[in-house]
């Protein structure tokens, strides 16, 4: 058994050594081919470089003009430069200084300030209208009429109404005219009658446990008061 194992191990070692030698030979051949290709490529690049030989640009350093010509050219250029500077200074003095250019941010700030001012002006001019309830309005009217003893009906419409009524009850031959004091006395009497009638009507509505005045309340008040009371 030991001799057989030794034979197997020796066979394996010989096989592995043969494989390693073959791999080394193959790698060496590949390296040689790579070196040959690199050398040929290098030679080709050198050959292409030799096709374009370098030439020194001597014309750049050689001057075709003499010293006298250079000096005259320099003097002419200096004179032209002085004339140009004088002309530029005169032109700058003649031209007006332009206004500074306003940037976009400056214009935007100005627009915002203008809109803000307009909004504040509108708010100051706009009146705040307060909404009152019907009960508040009624209380305001009661206090307003209690403070004054003036007539409640306008004078001109009342005078027009009186003339229309008199024209209906008179003929064309009769020419009735009213004095201003007579119309004022008639207006005071009619307003006193209406105010008294409405007071009694309101009392009847409250007696019926109502706030709203109705037609039947006024009819009952007229019946109680009599025809001319």
Curated annotation (Swiss-Prot):
Residue numbers spanned by region H3-like: 132-229
Keyword DNA-binding carried by entry: yes
Residue interval(s) of motif Nuclear localization signal: 115-132
Positions of the UniProt region annotated as Disordered: 1-78
Protein keywords: Centromere, Chromosome, DNA-binding, Nucleosome core, Nucleus, Ubl conjugation
Gene3D superfamilies: Histone, subunit A
Post-translational modification: Ubiquitinated. Is degraded through ubiquitin-mediated proteolysis when not protected by its association to the kinetochore.
Bias kind Basic and acidic residues: ranges: 53-68
Protein role: Histone H3-like nucleosomal protein that is specifically found in centromeric nucleosomes. Replaces conventional H3 in the nucleosome core of centromeric chromatin that serves as an assembly site for the inner kinetochore. Required for recruitment and assembly of kinetochore proteins, mitotic progression and chromosome segregation. May serve as an epigenetic mark that propagates centromere identity through replication and cell division. Required for functional chromatin architecture at the yeast 2-micron circle partitioning locus and promotes equal plasmid segregation.
Family: Belongs to the histone H3 family.
Subunit comment: Component of centromeric nucleosomes, where DNA is wrapped around a histone octamer core. The octamer contains two molecules each of H2A, H2B, CSE4/CENPA and H4 assembled in one CSE4-H4 heterotetramer and two H2A-H2B heterodimers. Interacts with the inner kinetochore. Interacts with the central kinetochore protein CTF19. Interacts with YTA7.
Other information: Mutation in CSE4 causes chromosome non-disjunction and cell cycle arrest at mitosis.
Name under which the protein is recorded: Histone H3-like centromeric protein CSE4
Source species: Saccharomyces cerevisiae (strain ATCC 204508 / S288c)
Encoding gene, per UniProt annotation: CSE4
